[in-house]
Each structure stands twice: as structure tokens, then as C-alpha cells.
Amino acid sequence: MALTFDEGPSGATKQILQVLKEKGVTATFFLSGDAVEASSATAKAIVDAGCEIGSNSYSDDSLKGQDREAVREQITKGTDAIKSATGVKTMLLRAPYAAFDEQNWIDAMDLVSAVVSWNIDSGDWLLNGADEQVSTVLD
């Protein structure tokens, strides 16, 4: 099992890192480049905590249906922002909304080593409170 977060970085990132530390586990955080630029110290804290970083593109907009140049720009700007803030050159991508089609892969295959998705979704942006989220994940 792997823990992954589509997590800004945002105000919740430090709390997530603290819980991971207390439990003795790490996770992979998929960050958008614009959020990294706004919170580079938090992005660096993720790496310093021993967690892996992947990109969620630059602006977290859907890549599906975008032309080759737009896809490549979103990926490149996202990974460049992450490298600038953390020193890590990532080639992991979690496409926003899991929207990454065969043409996107062809257009970006030299920029991305793997496109990571998920198989259990906490629905955290839809649910009210931790108890409801835990129930959703465990059910």
C-alpha cells in the first residue's frame, strides 16, 4: 500500500507531515507548481521529512484535450517549480483529475517516467469531517 496526497502544498501539509512522522511512515505528495511557488518552504519540508514528491502539473488544470505544447508546458513548469523549491527533479506525474490520455502520454513521454493514479479515493473534498472520510476509505 502506498499513501499519496494531492496536496498543494497547503495549510494542511504540515499537519499531514506531523501525523506521518508520528506513525513512522512516509508518503508521496503530488504538488502543483503554482502552489509550490507560493509555498516553497512547505514543499521543501516534504522532502526533508523523507517523503517523495511528484508533480500535479503546474496549474492543476486538466491535461486531457490540450495540445502537445500546452501539455509539455504544464508538466515542465510544474517540475521546474518543484526542483527550484526542493532540489528534486521528479518525473512522477499525477495528472489532474486523472485525465491523461494516450495522446498526452505520447506528447510527454520524455518528461514523465510514470503516471500515478489511485484506487481508493477518500473523497475528502466532498465529505464532512474525518470520521466520514475514514468510513469512506475503509468501506
Where are these regions (language model features)?
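Active-site beta->alpha N-cap acidic-glycine motif
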Residues: 1-66, 70-84, 90
